[in-house]
UniProtKB/Swiss-Prot annotation:
Record-given protein name: Large ribosomal subunit protein uL3
Family: Belongs to the universal ribosomal protein uL3 family.
Superkingdom in the source lineage: Bacteria
The gene coding this protein: rplC
InterPro entries tied to this protein: Ribosomal_uL3 (IPR000597), Ribosomal_uL3_bac/org-type (IPR019927), Ribosomal_uL3_CS (IPR019926), Transl_B-barrel_sf (IPR009000)
Pfam families for the chain: Ribosomal_L3
GO cellular component, one term: cytosolic large ribosomal subunit
Keyword Membrane recorded: no
Disulfide bonding pattern of the chain: none
Subunit structure: Part of the 50S ribosomal subunit. Forms a cluster with proteins L14 and L19.
Keyword entries, A-Z: Ribonucleoprotein, Ribosomal protein, RNA-binding, rRNA-binding
Molecular function, one GO term: rRNA binding
Length: 204
């Protein structure tokens, strides 16, 4: 089982044994319930599907109700699938104790959406800058986006203004600083994608 579903609580700081002030992120990870076990015979591959956070039946679609009732678990708001070889069975509960203090984890989440942004904020451009001969009101403009008659087009991938943020982001190798099993809290060194309350996938 390589990971669990969690929720970002917020950021804080913790002093290490050496006296360093470490920026940390607090996440509520689990408890997650196994809602489906996939096998090679039936599905063509082996995997485990887990659910996180209960929801009311009135907010659950008819196919979802059948799915959860077959597994004998309560209705879950979030689902995730992890590649795993037949170690778990439907109904098993996996808590934050799945992780250990001192290990390194990868965290996947959706970054904060910034809306439509220009090239200075989105790509770190300097802008056209000084008002030299013929320049006016171009301090934050991108400058040239290509040549003229050849190639007579703008190449794909050219950095321009556009939607910024609200994309899937993975932060790798974050050290687990502390585990608080009583409250299902996992504290890692550094920052993770998303705002407070956003859903995360935490992988070993």
């Amino acid at each position: 089982m390589p990971g669990l579903i969690g929720k970002k609580i917020g950021m804080t700081s913790i002093f290490s044994v050496e006296g360093k002030n470490l920026p940390c992120t607090v996440m509520e990870v689990g408890p997650c319930v196994v809602t489906q076990v996939k096998t090679v015979d039936k599905d063509g591959y082996e995997a485990v599907q887990v659910g996180f956070e209960d929801k009311k039946e009135k907010h659950t679609t008819k196919p979802e109700r059948g799915h959860f009732k077959r597994a004998g678990v309560s209705f879950k708001r979030y689902l995730a699938e992890f590649k795993e070889q037949g170690k778990y069975k439907e109904g098993d509960v996996i808590t934050v104790d799945f992780f250990n203090k001192g290990i390194y984890v990868d965290v996947v989440g959706i970054s904060k959406g910034k809306g439509f942004q220009g090239v200075v904020k989105r790509h770190g451009f300097r802008g056209v800058g000084e008002a030299t001969l013929g320049q006016s009101d171009r301090q934050r403009h991108p400058g040239s986006i290509g040549a003229c008659s050849y190639p007579a087009k703008v190449f794909k991938g050219t950095r321009m203004a556009g939607q910024m943020g609200n994309t899937k982001v993975t932060i790798q190798n974050l050290e687990v600083i502390e585990l608080i099993s009583k409250y299902n809290l996992l504290i890692v060194k550094g920052s993770v994608p998303g705002s407070k309350g956003s859903i995360l996938i935490v992988k070993k």
